[in-house]
């Protein structure tokens, strides 16, 4: 809030207070005088005594009128500020004071999106008294992702939970240096080493689903647990005791709750519990890293992402080594878990539902896998790369149901986007990944689930590359893109070849609910059994 704005609000509030104090004191004049004569006091003390007596004489009506005046003043000022900021940009004709369009965004998100899209590629709105730009055009979205002065905006409590050591809060040269350190963790060799872990955990969980398949299985709940098991397995290795991996999962879920709560850091609050869970995760990872440093120093074979990172560090020539502190590893892992847990869970759930709704596409996946692995051989990267149709299905799942439909940014300086649109400092910018994926003039027939769009004839992965924003763009482009796509492909492959499942629809269950990521409203209930 700029200084003149502060003075304006203070002036109005003081004026309102003066009016009511004056009126109240006039009614109790003699009584107040008598009271102050009986009690000797200093000037300040007498003033306070008068004020206390005056306030005590307010009627309920006066108090209510005062509250109305204050709220009306704030609301009018909010409208004035928004009018100044929006300029000639299109947007809603009226925005409710204080909360803005928050409730529309929460309770009727599709209606909110549709209205904003009709305003054009860039439109304005207001959420919780925050001036917001809603961007639907793919090219302008890319510009926002790449803009150095537009920073990721996670949540009000995110920095308290993850701390400024986490990847989303690192910028400039330190961020580039960290990404350079991370590259060896996503090479072909690294991805190949993670694959057996991913496959074994998927097999284990699908077997449990089949065992419990006589009753409805909720895909969202089960995919959440599966995805967390894979994350902990890849990051710390299956050689880490199961009790430790369970402790990581338990504390992560508590920490994750803190990103959507009120930013009140007091004992017993959700935010404080989230911070305490992060502290516990730091302790767990510190112990795991110490053991990894010893094993890799002894020349043992890497069994996890942490092992690979430590091994690469130890094998670098000393003059090329960057410092590899425990904090660097730990807060990078926490960033990975934060970024991937809900997003990948969303993609796995949509895999289950979309394949149940498109049996013809599922049949083609099965036919391709049967030709590549006739004896149900273990997966390897070479075979997975040959499964072109399966990979097209994965790409279409991510296009058709992008896990995060928008990625909020906040600009730390005045910037210009699109067709010379000036964005004042402190504006929240919402680049809509959903809108980019369904933009007219982008993907052909975008509302149709059609993996064939990515084949060698249509090549929409090339011709519509600008519209694909599921992994972001710019300095924070998802470095784990291939690991994430592999995880979905492994899940799709194993689910398709080892099970038969039916989607048990519920009234309204197919509606999409919006949070940080999207899910079907009922979480997708299925009945599942082993496939002959």
From Swiss-Prot:
The keyword Transit peptide does not apply. Gene3D superfamilies: Cytochrome P450. Keywords: Heme, Iron, Membrane, Metal-binding, Monooxygenase, Oxidoreductase, Transmembrane, Transmembrane helix. It is found in: Membrane. It is an enzyme of class 1 (oxidoreductase). Its main location: membrane. The chain crosses the membrane at residues 8-28. It is a single-pass membrane protein. Its cofactor is heme. Belongs to the cytochrome P450 family. This is Probable cytochrome P450 524A1. It comes from Dictyostelium discoideum.
